[in-house]
Curated annotation (Swiss-Prot):
Function: Involved in photosynthetic carbon assimilation. Catalyzes the NAD(P)-dependent oxidative phosphorylation of glyceraldehyde 3-phosphate (G3P) to 1,3-bisphosphoglycerate (BPG). The first reaction step involves the formation of a hemiacetal intermediate between G3P and a cysteine residue, and this hemiacetal intermediate is then oxidized to a thioester, with concomitant reduction of NAD to NADH. The reduced NADH is then exchanged with the second NAD, and the thioester is attacked by a nucleophilic inorganic phosphate to produce BPG. It can use both NADP and NAD.
Any one Gene Ontology molecular-function term assigned to this protein's record: NADP binding
Domain of life assignment: Bacteria
Top-level enzyme category: oxidoreductase
Taxonomic lineage: Bacteria, Bacillati, Cyanobacteriota, Cyanophyceae, Synechococcales
The protein's name: Glyceraldehyde-3-phosphate dehydrogenase 2
Subcellular location: Cytoplasm
Active site: 154 (nucleophile)
Source species: Synechocystis sp. (strain ATCC 27184 / PCC 6803 / Kazusa)
Keywords: Cytoplasm, Glycolysis, NAD, NADP, Nucleotide-binding, Oxidoreductase
């Protein structure tokens, strides 16, 4: 078993643990949590979740640990990864879920503390970080190549699978992406200071345009799309579930029915479990709790002039993404010698 510690027990950290608890054949064993909050608070937030509801599990806590269904997970609280007891706890893999230690220099502090490898639950910044998206390039994972790997962002995980299908079948020349994204913890719930002046505005009452590197990051996992995609995010007053709107110019003329056909086929075959397809007239809350990375909404696919293609895909930016973090961690575990 690969011994796992979670650094940062926020939205993704707790979703990761819930996803892992739902696996019956996991090669992972979560043994530790580092978070600024205390174990009793973290146990409460694990049990009661505004998006996911009450966790059906036997949960208890003391001053130093959380116990879930008889599994005791040690807890510590230290903002400096160099001080963490990863060596003492024999930690193999750290799930870096704070959103803070996203560079190689920052993430490898966990290695200096005794862990063997780090998986960042965010886009990595800078060199020497391997970026993998399950269903796109995770099959190329080489265990000895990187100490630090990244699961990219939730939006890249949504975009890359169906973007790859479009590129493979029609050839993407260039395009833009807009993600209409639920607000996150990196926004203010009331107007307050923030380095991004738009994210400084109250998240629950505004549409907040902001940057996203998701479109450009697709090139990290699909190299032939280097320099071909860009995009922005519109943060909206919903707490979960987001939707990607991709518009691309393609080399091979097509029609909407043909685009939907190849996407539906991929969802049922090569990308099954990662990509789903629907033509039902649904809304964002219908996709809450979906395990896949993206669900193409075929009813909204458009083609203009044969070579301009518009595809819409929904994603649960918390739960679906966290499922892929578990998947990637399982890939790491299976490659351990």
């Amino acid at each position: 078993m690969t011994r796992v510690a979670i650094n940062g027990f926020g939205r993704i950290g707790r979703n990761f643990l819930r996803c892992w608890l739902g696996r019956t054949d996991s090669q992972l064993e979560v043994v530790g949590i580092n978070d600024t909050s205390d174990p009793r608070t973290n146990a409460h937030l694990l049990r009661y979740d505004s998006m996911l509801g009450k966790l059906d599990a036997d949960i208890s806590a003391d001053e130093n640990s959380i116990t879930v269904n008889g599994k005791t997970i040690k807890c510590v609280s230290d903002r400096n990864p160099l001080n963490l007891p990863w060596a003492e706890w024999n930690v193999d893999l750290v799930i870096e879920a704070t959103g803070v230690f996203v560079t190689h220099e920052g993430a490898t502090k966990h290695v200096q503390a005794g862990a063997k490898k780090v998986l960042i639950t965010a886009p990595g910044k800078g060199p020497n970080i391997g970026t993998y998206v399950v269903g796109v390039n995770a099959h190329e994972y080489k265990h000895e190549e990187y100490e630090v790997i990244s699961n990219a962002s939730c939006t890249t995980n949504c975009l890359a699978p169906f973007g790859k299908v479009i590129n493979d079948n029609f050839g993407i020349i260039k395009g833009t992406m807009t993600t209409t994204h639920s607000y996150t913890g990196d926004q203010r719930i009331l107007d307050a200071s923030h380095r991004d002046l738009r994210r400084a505005r109250a998240a629950a009452v505004n549409i907040v345009p902001t940057s996203t590197g998701a479109a450009k990051a697709v090139a990290l996992v699909i190299p032939e799309l280097q320099g071909k995609l860009n995009g922005i995010a519109l943060r909206v007053p919903t707490p979960n579930v987001s939707v990607v709107d991709l518009v691309v110019q393609v080399e091979k003329n097509t029609i909407a029915e043909q685009v939907n056909g190849v996407l539906k086929e991929a969802a049922n075959t090569s990308l099954k479990g990662v990509l789903e397809y629907t033509d039902l007239e649904l809304v964002s809350s219908d996709f809450r709790g979906t395990d896949c990375s993206s669900t193409v909404d075929g009813s909204l696919t458009m083609v203009m002039g044969g070579d301009m293609v518009k595809v819409i895909a929904w994603y649960d930016n918390e739960w679906g993404y966290s499922q892929r973090v578990v998947d990637l961690a399982e890939i790491v575990a299976k490659n351990w010698k």
